[in-house]
Regions:
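Cytoplasmic helix-loop-helix junction between adjacent transmembrane helices
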Residues: 143-184
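Hydrophobic core of transmembrane alpha-helices in multi-pass small-molecule transporters
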Residues: 124, 138-155, 345, 356-373
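Extracytoplasmic gate region of multi-pass secondary transporters
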Residues: 65-66, 258-314, 373, 377
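Residue-level signature of mid-helix packing/kink "hotspots" within the transmembrane helices
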Residues: 63, 90-99, 154, 188-189, ...
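Helix-loop-helix hairpin linking two adjacent transmembrane segments in secondary transporters
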Residues: 180-231
């Protein structure tokens, strides 16, 4: 028997996920594990590689329009307001399908939802240049295309959370989610680097064609080698039917009455707000504060740091859980690094700093923020594995909304005060608030069980 956790009532588990037995507190009815839902280790490795590539291409497709916006504006005579309308369309579509995508993934399997959405946004990406030249109403067509891109991509991370909760043992979820985050950072880098070269050499259309083709090829590979002929509907053992029926009757309202759920959502909102603000305003900060600096340095180095940082954070969280440390303790420590230690590197930017110091601080802050992959981002699978996709979608929707609000507030502060210190102070305050709430109210015990107080894995 594995060593017991002491911080949150869970037990460590170092062996195969197929060797575990599940007992439910207050009932103590022995139940068979839902073994057929879990990936074998070789299959898990294949999925990690494919999902890493998928998240990379997802962000390449997402970044294509922002990178090409200047060239497209020149070609179609868009104003700044027109460009903003097109780019903003993605956000509204992205928020629309977060909960729906997660709910569908929980019911029919996240693999199916992810594949169907990938085919859709790959096709739309490849067809974007054709739509742009289809009629004289280019602005309306591109705004609608951008909105639909958000709708199609909005299901990706909720479906990923659902997949992770259903197919991956608890002690390996942090690394999977962190690997997906590192793939998104790589996609941002590739879109900014290779995309800019293609834009200059072959025109803006080439970027959409290339990314759409590669994304379609990825979806085809996913279907041929991992999806075809496989039933991905969540399976249940005979002895787990009673538990499932109770979970099915659990109202959503009961989840929203749980302090750990709101602590997780608020922490995610605060971190998303800080991250989106840095993502949006750091290039302007460097350009205004260090006008002689080389642009590729501060645009590339932080994201190069973020890739190994995300993988390291996920590995560390899984390592300590498998060593027998409490899941709640590990999640809070990872979130402390993602928000608390990150803020320690943001605070110096409020004063006078040299260019090398600013690059180091920003790179460290961006890198540390990825540790959330072993904290709040995977905590939803601890709290409510039966509806992890839908709950993650709810959390991610509010994260995106809060991010847009804080980006706008930061722009207002910069315009009114003509100072960057207020923005970095605001980021620090928001992070401290979210972290404090999560440290006090956060938990890792299941809250989606109507009649049970906790689940103990032996």
């Amino acid at each position: 028997m594995a060593d017991k956790h002491t911080s949150d009532g869970r037990n460590g588990f170092n062996g195969s996920p197929l060797d575990c037995e599940v007992y439910v507190a207050n009932d103590f009815t022995k139940q068979e594990p839902e073994d057929q839902n879990l990936w074998s280790r070789p299959l898990a490795r294949k999925w990690i590689v494919m999902l890493f590539m998928g998240s990379c291409l997802l962000y390449c497709a997402r970044m294509a329009m922002p990178i090409c916006a200047v060239s497209m504006a020149a070609s179609f005579h868009w104003s700044k307001i027109d460009s903003g309308l097109v780019l903003g369309g993605f956000f509204w579509g992205y928020c629309c399908t977060q909960i729906l995508g997660g709910y569908a993934s929980d019911k029919v399997g996240g693999e199916r939802v992810l594949f169907m959405s990938a085919v859709s946004w790959a096709l739309l990406t490849a067809c974007t240049p054709l739509l742009a030249h289809l009629s004289s109403h280019t602005l309306a067509l591109m705004t609608m295309a951008r909105f639909l891109m958000g709708v199609m991509q909005g299901v990706f991370f909720p479906s990923l959370a659902s997949i992770c909760s259903q197919r991956v043992v608890e002690g390996e979820r942090g690394f999977l989610m962190s690997a997906m985050a590192s793939g998104s950072h790589l996609g941002t880098l590739l879109a900014g680097g290779m995309g800019s070269l293609m834009l200059d050499q072959y025109g803006w259309e080439s970027m959409f064609y290339s990314i759409g083709f590669l994304a379609g090829l990825w979806a085809l590979t996913l279907w041929l080698y991992l999806l075809r002929g496989t039933d991905f509907s969540p399976k249940q053992t005979k002895t787990s039917c009673d538990l499932h029926s109770r979970l099915s009757r659990t109202p959503w309202l009961s989840l929203f009455k749980k302090p750990p759920v709101w602590a997780m959502v608020i922490a995610h909102m605060c971190l998303c707000s800080s991250f989106y603000t840095l993502l949006s305003w750091l290039p302007t900060f460097f350009k205004e504060s260090f006008p002689q600096a080389t642009g590729w340095v501060y645009n590339v180095i932080p994201w190069l740091i973020a890739i190994p940082s995300a993988l390291t954070g996920g590995y560390i969280s899984d390592f300590f859980i498998n060593q027998g440390y409490g899941v709640k303790l590990v999640r809070k420590i990872m979130q402390f690094f993602a928000m608390g230690v990150m803020s320690m590197f943001i605070m110096p930017l409020s004063g006078a700093v040299t260019y090398p110091t600013a690059v180091i601080c920003v790179s460290a802050a961006i890198g540390l923020s990825t540790f959330s992959g072993g904290g709040v981002n995977v905590n939803v699978q601890d709290l409510a594995p039966s509806c992890a996709g839908a709950l993650f979608g709810f959390m991610n929707m509010f994260g995106a909304l809060s991010g847009v609000v804080m980006v706008s507030v930061s722009g207002y502060l910069i315009e009114v005060t003509q100072s960057w210190a207020n923005v970095f102070s605001l980021i620090t305050l928001v992070n401290a608030t979210g972290l404090g709430i999560y440290i006090i109210f956060g938990d890792a015990r299941r809250v989606d069980l109507e009649d049970y107080s906790q689940v103990i894995v032996i």
